[in-house]
A protein has these predicted regions:
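Non-catalytic C-terminal accessory region of glycerolipid acyltransferases
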Residues: 75-222
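Catalytic core of membrane glycerolipid acyltransferases/transacylases, capturing the structured
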Residues: 2, 17-71
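Short acidic-hydrophobic, aromatic-tinged amphipathic segments that line or gate anion-handling sites
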Residues: 8-9, 66-70, 156
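A transmembrane-helix-recognition feature enriched in membrane-embedded lipid enzymes
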Residues: 1-9, 55-59, 202, 208, ...
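Glycine-rich helix-loop-beta junction characteristic of Rossmann-like nucleotide cofactor-binding loops
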Residues: 10-15
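Secondary-structure boundary/capping positions in well-ordered alpha/beta enzyme cores
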Residues: 7, 41-42, 66, 86, ...
């Protein structure tokens, strides 16, 4: 759609040719489509909602994706086979989509797999998807920005983020949240249509004069 602007940053020109564990924050069902667009050699670990979805379910099952309820330990050998075929494995470590855009606690599964399969981790930050298609209104498309940032690979044996998968879960989570906060500072401005509409909406029921003033003021300053 013309009212959705797309921005993509690839910090180190990642090609995904070397298999890795891809982790990303999760805001909207379009996150899945965005991650899969980065390479044809990406498969995902999905939750029960996606696995049983009338829209995505049959497609992802046919594509050989993995279901988190199977348990990581039971899937490891099948995943190892896909890795040998050149596939990266994408996971949303938060487990489910966020309602408010804030990143939630990370589960340990992705980091367990990185350690077990000896795969690097590629962190990806997604911004704006939850504003364009929110979890609460999955069929309503708003104006906004679809922004993605591929951060540098974290080597599986890089101990600067910890030496165990438990430590790496906490430290990489903190690292991604800090980077995401920087993106929000940059993008949460009236130049972003989604942020502009949210700002105006905050005043819309207070007074038509205040709403008019805010709209004019914001447009003059940006």
């Amino acid at each position: 759609a013309t009212f959705v602007r797309k921005e993509h940053i690839n910090v180190t020109n990642e090609t995904f040719k070397k298999p890795a564990i891809i982790i990303a924050n999760h805001q909207s069902f379009i996150d899945i489509l965005e991650l899969l667009s980065f390479s044809p050699k990406i498969i995902m670990i999905t939750n029960h909602w996606v696995w049983n979805s009338p829209v995505f379910g049959k497609i992802i099952q046919y594509a050989g994706f993995f279901h988190v309820d199977e348990g990581y330990e039971l899937c490891v050998e099948r995943m190892r086979k896909k890795v040998r075929e050149g596939y990266s494995i994408a996971i949303f470590p938060e487990g489910t989509r966020t309602y408010d855009g804030k990143m939630k606690r990370f589960h340990k599964g992705a980091f367990y797999l990185s350690e077990t399969l000896q795969l690097d981790i590629i962190p990806i930050l997604l911004y704006g998807n939850g504003e364009i298609i929110a979890k609460a209104q999955p069929f309503y498309v708003r104006k906004g920005i679809i922004y993605s940032k591929i951060l540098p690979r974290i080597l599986y044996n890089d101990d600067s983020f910890g030496t165990t998968y438990q430590e790496r879960t906490k430290r990489i989570s903190s690292y991604m949240k800090e980077e995401y906060a920087r993106i929000c500072l940059e993008k949460n401005t009236p130049a972003n249509p989604a942020f502009y509409e949210a700002l105006v909406l905050n005043y819309i029921y207070k007074s038509p004069v205040i709403e008019w003033y805010i709209r004019i003021k914001v447009k003059m300053e940006h």
